[in-house]
Amino acid sequence: MAIEQTAITRATFDEVILPIYAPAEFIPVKGQGSRIWDQQGKEYVDFAGGIAVTALGHCHPALVNALKTQGETLWHISNVFTNEPALRLGRKLIEATFAERVVFMNSGTEANETAFKLARHYACVRHSPFKTKIIAFHNAFHGRSLFTVSVGGQPKYSDGFGPKPADIIHVPFNDLHAVKAVMDDHTCAVVVEPIQGEGGVTAATPEFLQGLRELCDQHQALLVFDEVQCGMGRTGDLFAYRYYGVTPDILTSAKALGGGFPISAMLTTAEIASAFHPGSHGSTYGGNPLACAVAGAAFDIINTPEVLEGIQAKRQRFVDHLQKIDQQYDVFSDIRGMGLLIGAELKPHYKGRARDFLYAGAEVGVMVLNAGPDVMRLAPSLVVEDADIDEGMQRFAHAVAKVVGA
């Protein structure tokens, strides 16, 4: 079907794109720092961060420079060969974490798919072909492939696609007794987000994660931390596992890892990695020089005291604004999360209306997120300026007033 080449508008989306998204009515065309401009030149303060991706804001000079420099050198070579940016980034991640081996992919879904395949394969070759059970949690989110969406504990995303991968059990989050009730020697892995992002910005308790570590050790199962959303500085530590003092066997990272450029990583120990061999898994684009060069530049900035030590003060500034809004409009029952992954749960009177607040925010020039129908979510740049926080939250207060007065 021929499509007339006219001006690009929001209606163009409905004409040409698969209907799996419901994007905003405006189209962003430019970003700088924590500001976005649309086709009409309207300015927005961005507290959505591309869903916790643009950790250094839009068009950070160091990332732009890394992209331009690498773009003039080598873009893609495939994994028939290796490349210097991937090896440099791999070394940085290993030196900064528990891990001894890393593999790069293109998205959080792919990193988690790799992790789940490795966990099952490791159990098969080291223990038993019947050691296949994966324990995961209600309201979790681990990606959109058939395997990862099945491990995620949200039927609204996984139902309707035919048979799912078998031997996946879901139990309530933060409920160690529920895990104990289903844990046995057939379990190959427990998969958990230290902070459930899509599931409502709910943080695990230290006792829960420590208990999972002990149960995995008792049953020779692997503990897998999905830090796709909460990792790379988001909590104030480089990775959330360091805050909790609980070391996983496998960790996945994406989103902020590339600062806006698609890349993900799965990290593990040398012993666990040795279960794989050439051909066990792979990716055409994973670890390409362009992505790894940008991610390396992002890592060098995020993994600094200047960035990490400033996150709690920025969080408190957001929380102070949210509390002030709640005092004025009586809309939030809980303000939670960690670092700059912030959730504000709506009171019963406003249950199910999170997207109303999101849309109202866009109308007044502030971009926010929801985490389910009842929770507002903020995932701004880790280097967002105080002036941007203040102005953006003032705009959000106007958005709340619009919804409350509606």
Curated annotation (Swiss-Prot):
Q: Which GO terms describe its cellular component?
A: cytoplasm
Cofactor: how and how many bound: Binds 1 pyridoxal phosphate per subunit.
| GO MF annotation terms | identical protein binding; N2-acetyl-L-ornithine:2-oxoglutarate 5-aminotransferase activity; pyridoxal phosphate binding; succinyldiaminopimelate transaminase activity
Pathway-wise, it operates in:
Amino-acid biosynthesis; L-arginine biosynthesis; N(2)-acetyl-L-ornithine from L-glutamate: step 4/4; Amino-acid biosynthesis; L-lysine biosynthesis via DAP pathway; LL-2,6-diaminopimelate from (S)-tetrahydrodipicolinate (succinylase route): step 2/3
Q: Where does N(2)-acetyl-L-ornithine bind?
A: 144, 283
Binding sites annotated in the UniProt record for pyridoxal 5'-phosphate? 108-109, 141, 226-229, 284
Catalysed transformations (reactions): N(2)-acetyl-L-ornithine + 2-oxoglutarate = N-acetyl-L-glutamate 5-semialdehyde + L-glutamate; N-succinyl-(2S,6S)-2,6-diaminopimelate + 2-oxoglutarate = (S)-2-succinylamino-6-oxoheptanedioate + L-glutamate
- Residues where N6-(pyridoxal phosphate)lysine occurs? 255
Report the locations given in the UniProt record.
Cytoplasm
Q: What is its main location?
A: cytoplasm
Residues spanning the membrane: none
Keywords tagged on the record: Amino-acid biosynthesis, Aminotransferase, Arginine biosynthesis, Cytoplasm, Lysine biosynthesis, Pyridoxal phosphate, Transferase
Report if keyword Amino-acid biosynthesis is assigned. Answer: yes
E.C. numbers: 2.6.1.11, 2.6.1.17
Q: Which GO terms describe its biological process?
A: L-arginine biosynthetic process; lysine biosynthetic process via diaminopimelate
Domain of life of the organism in this record?
Answer: Bacteria
Q: Which cofactors does it use?
A: pyridoxal 5'-phosphate
Its family? Answer: Belongs to the class-III pyridoxal-phosphate-dependent aminotransferase family. ArgD subfamily.
User: What does this gene product do?
Assistant: Involved in both the arginine and lysine biosynthetic pathways.
Assembly behavior:
Homodimer.
Q: What else is known?
A: The reaction catalyzed by ACOAT is highly reversible. This enzyme may also transaminate ornithine.
The name under which this protein is listed is Acetylornithine/succinyldiaminopimelate aminotransferase
Originating organism: Shigella flexneri
